[in-house]
Structures are given as C-alpha cells and as structure tokens.
C-alpha cells in the first residue's frame, strides 16, 4: 500500500492471470507464488528503462527459485528453475497503478521436467 494504488491492475502471464486491487493480487498471485517457491535468489535486472509514467526491468534469468510447493496445479519438484521476466510498470502520481509481467513459463516448466509444448501435441 506504500507503493501501489489500491485499485492497481496486475496483468500476469497466461496460466497465472490478472488481478485488480492489492488484496486480490496478494490472494491470487503473490501469496501462492511465495508459498510455492523457496531459496529465491536476488533479482538480476540486466536492463532497466523509464519514459514518462512508465518504467520496467528485464532479466534473463531475472532470478532463480526452488519449486518447493504446488504451483499452477503442478506438484513440487524440489528443483531450482530460472525465471525469465519482463516487468513493465505505469505510475499514477507517487504510486504504481499497473504492472504488465511476462514470464517465460515454458522455459521454467521445461527445467522442472514438464515440456508443455510436447505434451500439447501428444494430446491431439
């Protein structure tokens, strides 16, 4: 609440979804995410940018974490995975109002032993 507008919008990647308001963000994304991962590394923002009311950062990988709990309906693997992330923000006044986040989930799941694209073609 110190940095976000109460009616903030968080536009998450496919498979995770989007949320409206700080409370819903905590319930639908940040809480489950924090509960599913341990041993999270520091972020590695290779690129930072800002223009007007917009800013963002990118990292390949942005951070690593161990899948120690259920995430996206998948069980814990105990494996460490890389997160490739693009994070773009919009500011309104002194607070953040919107966040668009792109996570290469195909890459993450492949590191966990799940090849999503191969599994999709097998189902046909």
Model-inferred region functions:
Residues 1-124:
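C-terminal and inter-domain tail/linker signature
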């Amino acid at each position: 609440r110190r940095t976000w507008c109460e009616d903030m919008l968080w536009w998450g990647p496919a498979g995770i979804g989007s949320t409206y308001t700080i409370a819903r963000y905590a319930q639908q994304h940040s809480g489950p995410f924090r509960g599913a991962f341990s041993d999270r590394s520091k972020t590695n923002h290779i690129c930072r940018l800002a223009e007007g009311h917009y800013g963002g950062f990118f990292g390949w990988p942005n951070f690593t974490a161990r899948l120690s709990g259920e995430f996206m309906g998948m069980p814990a693997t105990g494996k460490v995975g890389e997160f490739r992330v693009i994070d773009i923000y919009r500011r309104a006044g002194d607070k953040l109002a919107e966040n668009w986040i792109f996570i290469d989930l195909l890459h993450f799941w492949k590191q966990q032993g799940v090849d999503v694209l191969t599994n999709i073609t097998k189902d046909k």
